[in-house]
Amino acid sequence: MYRQHEHQSTSAECGCKKGAVNSENNQFIGVSHGGKTTKIHAVVDALGNPVHFLLTAGNIFDASAAIDLLSGVNISGSNILGDKAYGAKSIRAYIAEQGASYTIPPKSNVVEPWFCDFHTYKERHLIECFFNKLKVFRRVATRYDKLAVSFLAFVHLASIWILLK
C-alpha cells in the first residue's frame, strides 16, 4: 500500500503557467446553466456540408465569435444566413465589406429594422441538420476530450465521416 506524505497534495492544478498552451484558459470550457460546456460554431455551404469550425467556451455569446468564424472563409458573392443573434451592426457591416449579402432577421426591439427574405431564410435549417448529424457522435455530444485541439480534431473527423456517407 502506498501512502502519501501528510503535506503532499493531490491538487487538481496542473502546474502550468496561466496562458500556457495546455492550461485550462485555452481549452474553451465555459460554465453555463448546463454545466461546463464548449460551443462549436460552424459554417456550412449551400448543401449543408461543413466548411469551417471554431470553438468557444459555453458561456460566450454566439455573435462575439461570428467575425472570427467568417474570416476563415471566403464569403464574397455569397449569401450569409444567420439567426437573430447575428444581427449586430458590426457583423452585418463585415459581411457587406467582404462583398456578400446577408439574410438575418432583425430582433423585435431593433430601432431600424432591415429587410429579410424569409423564403431564403428557411434554408437556415441546413446548419441545424448538420449539427443534428454531428451530435450523433457521442464523443462530440459529450466532449470526452480534455484538450480543445483533440476535441476540434474529432469534430473534423466526424465531419469527414458525415461527408463520406
Region spans (language model):
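Mature extracytoplasmic/luminal segments of secretory-pathway proteins
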Residues: 11-13, 113, 126
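Short hydrophobic "helix-edge" motifs at membrane interfaces and signal-peptide entry regions
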Residues: 73-74, 117-119
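Polybasic low-complexity intrinsically disordered regions
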Residues: 1-107, 158-159
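Short, charged, surface-exposed secondary-structure boundary motifs
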Residues: 64, 111-117
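Basic, amphipathic alpha-helical segments enriched in Lys/Arg and hydrophobic/aromatic residues
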Residues: 93, 98-101, 109, 118-165
